[in-house]
Each structure stands twice: as C-alpha cells, then as structure tokens.
Amino acid sequence: MAFADRLLAAWYAGHPALALLRPLEALYRRVVTRKRARFLRGDSASYRAPVPVIVVGNITVGGTGKTPMILWLIEHCRRQGLKVGVVSRGYGAKPPQLPWRVQADQAADQAGDEPLLIVQRTGVPLMIDPDRSRAVQALLASELLDLILCDDGMQHYRLARDLELVLIDAARGLGNGRCLPAGPLREPADRLREADAVLFNGASEDRTDGFGFCLQPSALVNVRTGERRALDHFPAGQRLHAVAGIGNPQRFFNTLLGLNWQPVPHPFADHAQFSARSLAFSPPLPLVMTEKDAVKCRAFAADDWWYLAVEAQPTPAFSAWFDNQLQRLLRKP
C-alpha cells in the first residue's frame, strides 16, 4: 500500500499516531481560516460573474461522487431549458495554454480525466484553469450561458459563488474530524454550516444534516467500442479484474460486489495514468473500471475491457430544493 493510501486509511480510522501531526494541523487551520476571512471582509478581491455560479465541491480529501452529481445537475438544468457551462481546475491536465476549452476528442492528459468525461457525456461547454475566475470569464466570452457549475473550487475564494453544494461520503463521513495533515479535512468542519446544502453519497434517504443521494449502476460499456450492455452481461459470481484510480476505490469495489460479481481489486492513485502494460493482469479475466479511468484507456483497450456507467440519484427533496434555488437565482430583477 502506497504512503498516500496508508495516510488516507489512518485519517478515516483515527490512528493515534496522527496526534504527532497536530502542530502542523494548527498551522494549516490558521492559514485557511485567515484566507477565507480576508475574502469575507473584502480585503482580497473576488470575481462575481454576471450569471449565477454554483460550486460543487467537498471539504474532505478523497472521492465523494462529485462528477456523477455534476452530470445530474447538468441534465437537470437542461431539462428546464437552461444553458449550462462548467469550469474545472483540470487536475493533472497539461493543456497548451490556460484557460483551455475542453473538446470531446482531446486526449485525457491534455484535458484532464474528469473534464473530458463531462464533455464526452454531455457536450457541455467546459473550460479548465486552476484560476476558476479566469476560466469563467473565458467561458462567458465565448458562450451565452444561463448559469455556471464550478467543478470543485470550494476553497477557491477568488471566484464568488451564488450557491455551494458540499458532498460527503456517507460511510466515511469526516474521518477523524481533523484538518490536513492530521486528518482529511481541507477546511474545519464548521465550514459546513456556511454551505447552502450538504449531500451525503450513499444515503438513500435525507438526513437531519443534509440530503441523500446514491450512485446507481446503469450499464456496462465497452471501453474500446462504446457498446453498451445490460448489467446481466456478466453472470452472478463472475470473476473479473477491477481497476479504480479514484479518490475512494473501495466504494467502486463494493459496488461490484453488490452486483454479485467477484472483483480482483486493483486500486490506483486518484487521476493515475495507465498503459496496456500497467493493466496486464493475471490470470486473464474481463476487466471492469470506472468511467473516469476509461477515458484514459480507449487508445489501448482490449476487447474485454468495460467500464461501469453510474448515475447519481438524489432524493426528491433535494430535487425540489434545487429547483427552488434555481428559481431564486434566475429570477429577473
């Protein structure tokens, strides 16, 4: 197990040795708290877009189902006739310039795996740039949009936001409740009180402290050809290699177990780069990966490589709440 994986496991298990990192945690908390306070006071400038900006992010390190939720938000807004754009940091991307407009036929190392997935699934206009405010301005210069979704960026206060949606893994929660590096929190837990909504991935019902949503498997898709198959393409008990280069690989492996398959788990670091050699496992079995990983593997995928398509399913209460927020944000003065 890599050091990063061991540290992540310790954060969520509450390992006592993490107490040694509390002096560094105190320094980190002071820095992030002061940074946010400067923007709240107006001492540091932020850019406010002429259209509503909705930030979808988290305060923890590790996967929370952010990309599937963004896909749901895009389609939900489109069904109401809204023109939606997306901005993202483009973690790991190496574009020729910044800001960079992501196109569906670009390579993942140029566009970033998550932005490329979003564009390939939805065709939405999407701009990447670590400076989210610059990305928003570039997007609005080329598109007439009704609103913008910011993929992550909770801590990017240079971009003013009209709505904050925070995602949390319902099973792991906030771990030991400590900030980096003694715990998984990017900001202190009381930051959640300032968010407009908290959504718990893996909660089939709403909670007193937020809404619930689940990731529902919908199909198997061939990585090389794009052919879609029903989930019963593999019979119960099917052994297969399972690849996950995401923030919480175990959640993916558990999903495969829940489909009555027998995965041989191969966890990789989040945003890992793959090659045919790195995925040449023994014994020869069908291989199933996440959709985020699949966008990086199409060029060298074998015939029996598949990705599991999943769809975010928030509760009806969240859908109703979100519709009310859209009406508020888009109400003409």
From Swiss-Prot:
Pathway: Glycolipid biosynthesis; lipid IV(A) biosynthesis; lipid IV(A) from (3R)-3-hydroxytetradecanoyl-[acyl-carrier-protein] and UDP-N-acetyl-alpha-D-glucosamine: step 6/6. Keywords: ATP-binding, Kinase, Lipid A biosynthesis, Lipid biosynthesis, Lipid metabolism, Nucleotide-binding, Transferase. GO terms for cellular component: plasma membrane. It is an enzyme of class 2 (transferase). GO terms for biological process: lipid A biosynthetic process; lipopolysaccharide core region biosynthetic process. Its EC number is 2.7.1.130. ATP binds at residues 60-67. It comes from the Bacteria. It catalyses: a lipid A disaccharide + ATP = a lipid IVA + ADP + H(+). GO terms for molecular function: ATP binding; tetraacyldisaccharide 4'-kinase activity. Transfers the gamma-phosphate of ATP to the 4'-position of a tetraacyldisaccharide 1-phosphate intermediate (termed DS-1-P) to form tetraacyldisaccharide 1,4'-bis-phosphate (lipid IVA). Belongs to the LpxK family. PANTHER family: TETRAACYLDISACCHARIDE 4'-KINASE (PTHR42724), TETRAACYLDISACCHARIDE 4'-KINASE, MITOCHONDRIAL-RELATED (PTHR42724:SF1). This is Tetraacyldisaccharide 4'-kinase. It comes from Pseudomonas putida (strain ATCC 47054 / DSM 6125 / CFBP 8728 / NCIMB 11950 / KT2440).
